[in-house]
């Protein structure tokens, strides 16, 4: 029998300031990968992480 898909999924977090800010340290968009339990956290995650392109801590939002 095949196993059912688990509750944990891999998500991608993207910096919100890299998309809008033109005067940053280097070109590109900062992205992190993480896991979340889709049964406990149904809405999209927002975490403060360090952005290497902006060179500061910024809000990273979950993207599809």
UniProtKB/Swiss-Prot annotation:
InterPro entries, per database record: Ribosomal_bL33, Ribosomal_bL33_CS, Ribosomal_bL33_sf, Ribosomal_zn-bd
Keywords: Ribonucleoprotein, Ribosomal protein
Pfam families, alphabetized: Ribosomal_L33
Domain of life from the UniProt record: Bacteria
Disulfide bonds: none
BP terms from Gene Ontology: translation
Annotated family: Belongs to the bacterial ribosomal protein bL33 family.
HAMAP family for the chain: Ribosomal_bL33 (MF_00294)
NCBIfam families in the cross-refs: PRK00504.1, PRK00595.1, rpmG_bact
Protein name, per record: Large ribosomal subunit protein bL33
Organism of this sequence: Nostoc punctiforme (strain ATCC 29133 / PCC 73102)
Species lineage: Bacteria, Bacillati, Cyanobacteriota, Cyanophyceae, Nostocales
Gene: rpmG
């Amino acid at each position: 029998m095949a196993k059912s898909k688990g509750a944990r999924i891999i998500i991608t977090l993207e910096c919100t300031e890299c998309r809008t800010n033109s005067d940053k340290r280097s070109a590109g968009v900062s992205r992190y990968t993480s896991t979340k339990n889709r049964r406990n956290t149904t809405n999209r995650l927002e975490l403060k992480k360090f952005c290497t392109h902006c060179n500061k801590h910024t809000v990273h939002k979950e993207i599809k």
